[in-house]
Design a protein with these regions (language model features):
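Structured catalytic/nucleic-acid-binding cores of DNA maintenance enzymes
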Residues: 1-351
Length: 351
């Protein structure tokens, strides 16, 4: 499943290539990808057509595009995208006209633009970019574009959700004084329950620590709880726990303040490093908007390395092999020397 780095990579791609473009038409190929848009495909198509892609935002694994009305004002709802297990957002730029209509290059480019990807679910036909508000792209392409939602397993989807305020306490007073909540502090109603992620400028480690202290669940289960800390999935949870030398079943409430700080630092470092590498791609299901794979898989220390030497132990002259253990219908990877099991592993969330 795409986690924070993969979704952020897609968000950045949309921000660079698609903002400021009007939606000329919407084609719903498979209505199953609109299961969360309760008013149906016809309403989805009508509500998007004529609006302009204004801003690209993310919280955890959720991505949303704010919209402008024809007069440039901010629309009261946003287009929410969840990639699920295998979702992709792909950008296809319409070829220019400078090569001549009978040019072989022009025909090849047109054929690539018109090609429909396998597992295409929703297609947005976008017009040329133009200045429509504060959060617009610097890419002023004069040709059209297609924004394609492709999803092999159909666990992801798209839907429109009303925008609601979600102002951090540290800025709430200033926002109230201004009399109007700025766009950066508006989120889709469907996303508001999602906790802020470690790359959010208003992420609050102290609040996360308080949540840890209230639960006896294993720490990995808590890391995967998007209402506690968002954006972390199985891969990055295992990687962060390896760096922090913590067993996945250690009860969250037993972590010391130092262990909590080190774990959250490890989570943040892993996410930043993966983001810099374009995310983790184990197969063709995860790509950026241009169809390119990330390469953080080359840097993994625990996840997917069962039977291979622990890098840290090897550096210390020890031999310890990464083990794979069952965890909530999936797997956990750890070093049995660096990440020793707690005295009693029979805690909630350890399996």
């Amino acid at each position: 499943m795409p986690e924070l780095p993969e979704v952020e990579t897609v968000r950045a791609g949309i921000a660079n290539h698609s903002l400021g473009r009007p939606v000329r038409a919407v084609r719903v190929v498979d209505a199953r990808s609109l299961r969360r848009h309760l008013t149906g495909p016809a309403h989805f198509e009508a509500a998007l057509t004529g609006r302009v892609l204004r801003g690209a935002y993310r919280r955890g694994k959720y991505l949303w595009l704010t919209l402008s009305e024809a007069d440039g004002t901010l629309a009261d709802e946003a287009l929410v995208v969840h990639l699920g297990m295998s979702g992709q957002l792909l950008v296809r730029d319409e070829p220019g006209r400078d090569l001549g209509s009978d040019s072989g290059n022009d025909l090849q480019a047109r054929a690539a633009f018109d090609e429909q990807p396998r597992h295409l679910r929703v297609a947005l036909e976008l017009g040329p970019a133009g200045a429509t508000g504060d959060a617009v792209s610097t890419n002023r392409a004069c040709t059209g574009q297609r924004l394609l939602f492709v999803d092999q397993r159909i666990f992801g989807g798209m839907f429109l959700s009303p925008m609601v305020p979600d102002v951090p306490a540290v800025v709430a007073v200033n926002e109230a004084a201004a009399g109007e909540v700025s766009e950066r502090f508006l989120v889709p109603e469907a996303v508001k329950h999602i906790a802020r992620d470690p790359l959010d400028e208003f992420f609050d480690p102290a609040a996360v620590r308080r949540k840890f202290l209230r639960t006896s669940s294993g720490i990995k289960k808590v890391l995967l709880d998007q209402s506690v800390i968002s954006g972390v999935g199985n891969i990055y949870a295992d990687e962060a726990l390896w760096r922090a030398r913590l067993h996945y079943a250690k009860p969250a409430r037993t972590l010391s303040a130092t262990q909590t700080r080190e774990l959250l630092e490890a989570v943040t470092q892993v996410l930043r490093e993966s983001l810099a590498a374009g995310g983790t791609s184990f197969d063709a299901l995860y790509v950026n908007v241009l169809g390119e794979s990330g390469y953080f898989a080359r840097s993994l220390n625990a996840y997917g390395r069962a039977g291979e030497p622990c890098h840290r132990c090897a550096e210390a002259g020890r031999t310890s092999l990464i083990v794979r253990e069952p965890f909530q219908n999936r797997s956990s990877y750890r070093c049995p020397h660096c990440q020793r099991a707690p005295r009693s592993r029979q805690v909630e969330g350890s399996r």
